[in-house]
């Protein structure tokens, strides 16, 4: 008997303790989040502590590639405030990428497969967007009403623009959550099929090579999806921030 492929997304308490209505339990999701952040901080601590080498190591090449690719993304998508928002967007991109890849490690936990986690990331971006928009004062209303719009169309366009703007963080969060959850579920299903065929014996023992090969291919695709989803989340965040800056 095999467990449900969705059990891998269950949040389990590793250390339970609390007081009255408050629960301070340490869960697998919390532990994975701390590991992702610690790994990110450790890499860059080592890089800046030991300095940059004229003949870079593999880790230095990876980190420099991560930095320059994110910088190019922000520089191309964000307006005049790009030096101020780059550190934030770089941390967002790195954290999502590390979390996505870490979720592919056996017996690990994919925190980006939970809507609450991706929603927190999306709301963090949109809190910054709202702060930038409010800095424009009354000019921020042009974000919901394009110039030259007639009064008749304004009554139709303004509610539509407001609703679409409110749902942007939700779409940003759901896109990341759904892709990661679907990919990991598919991997678990294919792995369960291959394992069942191996345990059946006979011709199925030989035929299990087929789903096993599919599993290897899907694992490679899931690595690509982990990078693509981090990129998509970051590029959309750049676009939303740029729209808030130029009110477009």
Swiss-Prot record:
Segments spanning the bilayer are 29-49, 85-105, 115-135, 143-163, 176-196, 201-221, 227-247
> What do the Gene Ontology cellular component annotations say?
mitochondrial inner membrane; proton-transporting ATP synthase complex
Q: Where in the cell is it found?
A: Mitochondrion inner membrane
Which CDD domains does the annotation name? ATP-synt_Fo_a_6 (cd00310)
Query: In this UniProt entry, which cysteines form S-S bonds?
Result: none
Q: Does the keyword Ion transport apply?
A: yes
As for membrane topology, the entry says: Multi-pass membrane protein
* MF (Gene Ontology): proton-transporting ATP synthase activity, rotational mechanism
- PROSITE patterns given in the database record: ATPASE_A (PS00449)
Tell me which UniProt keywords the record has, alphabetically.
Answer: ATP synthesis, CF(0), Hydrogen ion transport, Ion transport, Membrane, Mitochondrion, Mitochondrion inner membrane, Transmembrane, Transmembrane helix, Transport
For this protein, the record's Gene3D superfamilies field holds: ATP synthase, F0 complex, subunit A
Q: Which Pfam families match?
A: ATP-synt_A (PF00119)
The protein's assembly and partners: F-type ATPases have 2 components, CF(1) - the catalytic core - and CF(0) - the membrane proton channel. CF(1) has five subunits: alpha(3), beta(3), gamma(1), delta(1), epsilon(1). CF(0) has three main subunits: a, b and c.
Describe its function.
Mitochondrial membrane ATP synthase (F(1)F(0) ATP synthase or Complex V) produces ATP from ADP in the presence of a proton gradient across the membrane which is generated by electron transport complexes of the respiratory chain. F-type ATPases consist of two structural domains, F(1) - containing the extramembraneous catalytic core and F(0) - containing the membrane proton channel, linked together by a central stalk and a peripheral stalk. During catalysis, ATP synthesis in the catalytic domain of F(1) is coupled via a rotary mechanism of the central stalk subunits to proton translocation.
**What family is this protein classified in?**
Belongs to the ATPase A chain family.
Protein's UniProt name? ATP synthase subunit a
Upper lineage: Eukaryota, Sar, Stramenopiles, Ochrophyta, PX clade
